[in-house]
């Protein structure tokens, strides 16, 4: 078989982060952040990217990697793109504070639509949302991306062909 240079998890993470960041910028500036289906599209983009890169990693290693090796590659890629995305989202909200205010206002509107919530509860909820905004953004992004990354890594490792070397098949010396 021909010798292939394996792709690194850093490269895979950078490419996926780039795709997700471009997608986030486009949806924010086009005002499409309220559409839930686009959020799911972002997760499918991550899962599809991980499956592609895990498969390419297996292919570059002549499919000799085990399920655990392939999953680890995908999860390390997840760590890279999650870290980059969190840095991006912090910088993005600092550069565009109006987007933070719009997201808080959307949260207020959703609370106002609920008939069981009083104005006092809405004000208290908004106070808490403002106080813990950064914890919610960073923690929420971290949690969701790690879960989605684990799913993508599992699927990528599962669909990649595996022909690991058996250590007992080595010729005697």
Residue ranges and their predicted role:
Residues 88-114:
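Functional transmembrane-helix hotspots
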Residues 7-15, 72-84:
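Alpha-helical transmembrane segments of multi-pass membrane proteins
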Residues 19-27, 46-50, 81-89, 148, ...:
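Alpha-helical transmembrane segments of multipass membrane proteins
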Residues 134-162:
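Transmembrane alpha-helical segments in integral membrane proteins
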Residues 56-70:
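Membrane-helix interface/capping segments
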Residues 1-6, 161-173:
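Short, charged juxtamembrane terminal tails flanking transmembrane helices
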Residues 1-56:
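Transmembrane alpha-helical insertion/packing segments
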Residues 110-133:
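Short membrane-interface loop/juxtamembrane segments of multi-pass integral membrane proteins
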């Amino acid at each position: 078989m021909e010798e292939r240079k394996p792709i690194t998890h850093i490269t895979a993470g950078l490419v996926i982060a780039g795709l997700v960041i471009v997608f986030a910028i486009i949806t924010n500036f086009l005002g499409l952040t309220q559409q839930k289906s686009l959020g799911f599209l972002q997760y499918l983009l991550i899962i599809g990217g991980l499956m592609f890169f895990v498969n390419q990693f297996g292919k570059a290693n002549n499919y000799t990697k085990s399920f655990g090796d392939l999953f680890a590659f995908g999860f390390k890629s997840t760590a890279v793109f999650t870290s980059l995305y969190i840095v991006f989202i912090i910088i993005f909200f600092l550069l565009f504070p109006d987007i933070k205010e719009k997201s808080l206002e959307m949260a207020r509107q959703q609370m106002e639509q609920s008939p069981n919530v009083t104005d006092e509860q809405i004000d208290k909820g908004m106070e808490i949302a403002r106080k813990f905004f950064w914890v919610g953004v960073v923690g929420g992004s971290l949690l969701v991306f790690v879960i989605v990354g684990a799913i993508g890594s599992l699927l990528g490792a599962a669909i990649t062909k595996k022909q690991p070397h058996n250590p007992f098949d080595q010729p005697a010396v």
